[in-house]
Each structure stands twice: as C-alpha cells, then as structure tokens.
Amino acid sequence: MKLHTAITLAALALTASVASAQQGVSKDEIILGSIQDLSGPLAGYGKQTRNGMMLAVDELNEQGGINGRKIKLLVEDSGYDPKKAVLAAQKLVNQDKIFMMVGHIGTAHNMAAMPVQFEKNVINFMPLSAAREMYEPFHKLKYSFAGAYYDQIRYATPKLVKEKGLKKVCTLYQDDDFGLEVLKGGEAGLKTLNMTYAEKTSYKRGATDFSSQIQKLQAANCDMVVLGTIIRETIGAIGTARKMGYNPVFLGSSAAYTDLIHKLGGKAMDGFYAAMTSQNPYTDDASQPIRFWSNKYKTKFNEDPAVFSVYGYQIITNFANAANKAGKNLTTESFIKVMDTLSIAPDIFGSPAQSFSPTRHLGSDAARLSQIQDGKWKPVSEYFGDDVKAPAGKAAKK
C-alpha cells in the first residue's frame, strides 16, 4: 500500500512538473519563432529581417546565450498571405512549441496570427508593423517598438508645411488599412494648421500605373503629396511625377523608408522624405559603429544590410535584454514583469529611447525625418512625437 501511494505521489509530482514547465524553455535552450515573407512581395524585407535576427542570435550564442541557455530561432514563410500566417503560427505555437513570436511582418498577418498565440499564452514581441493594432487595444501579450504610421504622418506633415511654407497638401494612398492610416494621420496633422487635403486620390494594391493619379494631383496644384505607399508604388508615383515635370514635396511613412527606393528608383528619388526610427546602415557610413556592424553583416551574408536587417537585430537584442533580467526562471510571466518596467537606451542606429509600463506596451511613438540625398538616406530632423514632449524618463500616456 505504501509503495502504491509513493508511486502515485511521484506520478502526480511529475505531472505537475510537466504542467508547470514553460513552453519553449528548456534547461539548455529558448525557442523563438518568427513569421516572415520569404517568397512574396515583401521577400526583400523578410530576408533582411531574418538575417538581422540570425546575426544577433549567433552573437548571443557565441557569448554563452541567455543565463546559460542558447537561442534557437525558427522562421516560417507566410508569402505575405494572412491565411498562411495563421498556418505558420499554428505550426510554431502548437508543434514547435515556441516560447515567443518575434518580429512577425505585416499588419493583417499579425492580426490573424495573434489569437493562435494568445490561446497558448505566447507573447507577440515587437512585430514589423507600425499599425496601432500592434499595441491597441491593450493586451498583456502585445509588445511593440514601432510608432504608428498615423502618428508619424500626423507630426511630419505640419512640420514640413511650416518649414517650407507649403500651401496645398494632397495625398496618394493605397486603398487599404495601411493607406487609410497614412491618410488619417495627414488629416490630423493638417487640422492643427486649420488646413485640409486639397486633393485625395488612391490606388488598388498591386497597381503599377499612377499616371491618372499624378495628373489629378498636378492639376490641383498640390505642392506637397503625402504618400500612403510602400516600395514599388513609391517609386512608381514619384518616377511618374518626375517624367511629367511635376516636383512637389513627397512625404512617406516608415513603410517607404528602405534603401530599395533609391537603389531601384535611381536619381529620380532624390528629395523624397520619409519618417524613420533607425538609420539605414551603409558600409561606408560616417558613423564608425554603424560602419563596423554593416561590414560584419556583409561578411556573414555576402550582401549589404538594410534597415530591416537592423530591425531584426534590434528585436532579438531587446528580447535578450529582458530575458537576461528575468533570470534563470524564464517564464512568460517573469518576462512580462521585466518588460513592464523596462527602459531601452538609444542604440548605434540612432533609435529613440524606449520605455514600457504595465499599462503601455508601445516602447516609443517618436520618429524623425530622413531624406534621400545623392542616392542615400540622410536624417534631416530631430525626433518628434508625444513621447519626445514627455518629461525625461517618462513615456507619454496613450
């Protein structure tokens, strides 16, 4: 009888131990998952992000990992399809048993995948989307580092209008949730100047001909155009305008802040402004730390890094920062406890300081302007945003 009781108690103890074990964390390893576009329209971004993450993971593992645990990064391809993103999330969460989802790319894709993660208490950490849904409504498992497209344009539009004495502001935007965020941000910014858009025109996702839209903006004598565009559409719209001899001030969001704009669009892209938070790294950058990092990346992957490489690197670095502070007993709850009081200092890429709290999971809404000059992005403003106005060390409440 005593033997039977002892065996029963041992079995119960083992069951309790297994039940309380943290998914994705073992004695020697932490498993992270990421969903990227590796085969669709944003494959360039996805591959750069993956490489940046891999560089950070390799560096951390070479240094002994996090409290003795090595990081294992699993990356799935969504092809930039929200339905595939759900399948990828199901695989990573339910089969691979990841501890956390890191740097998932795409707004609709994150929205589709988050319910799968949250059902298993898996954090959505610093997704590659600047949509407000990445941190609103508040959820304990959502953490974002990207200020919203809406806020970027809300601040940048009146800034340029005042600096350049512009009279007629118009917009060309993608007819979807992303484009509408940019549209609304511009409207809110113009409202502070008692102005409204002089003209609005849109295009369907995948469009390649922008001649009718540009003609409409030119006919309205717009001297500034807010672009709710990403890569191909930014190049197409500006390129079309240049050919027509139409040269307003063009402003885009961080979605258009990529070296692909000037690499693919050429000289015609000079003068284009975009909001940004981290500098695009160049191997001949004036900053020695950026130059060193860029060349290290190029040596490893045999290609130049880009700003999405930086995002991937930052996301893993930020995860490691918090996970280290959570100590040996790394769980979702211990990680949240650290994150909810965490401050992150500016890094070599010129990113703004970030801070999180138990009621605010956006690190910073700050952004600044960069402009393409002589075929390269150059920062041309200080940071702006609600957080910049907040007292030192305190993020503005949302």
Could you tell me what each predicted segment is?
Residues 85, 144-168, 207-211, 234, ...:
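Hydrophobic alpha-helical segments within soluble ligand-binding/sensing domains
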Residues 25, 31, 44-51, 59, ...:
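Beta-alpha junction/loop-to-helix N-cap segments that form part of ligand/metal-binding clefts
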Residues 83, 97-201, 249-274:
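Extracytoplasmic ligand/sensor domains, especially the bilobed periplasmic-binding protein
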Residues 1-31, 384-398:
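Short, low-complexity disordered leader/linker segments with a strong preference
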Residues 300-309, 320-377, 394-398:
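Segments of small-molecule ligand-sensing domains
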Residues 37, 58, 317-325:
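Short glycine/serine- and small hydrophobic-enriched flexible loop segments
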Residues 238-312, 383-391:
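Extracellular/periplasmic periplasmic-binding protein-like sensory domains
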Residues 33-41, 274-275:
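Acidic/histidine-rich, surface-exposed loop or edge segments in extracytoplasmic proteins
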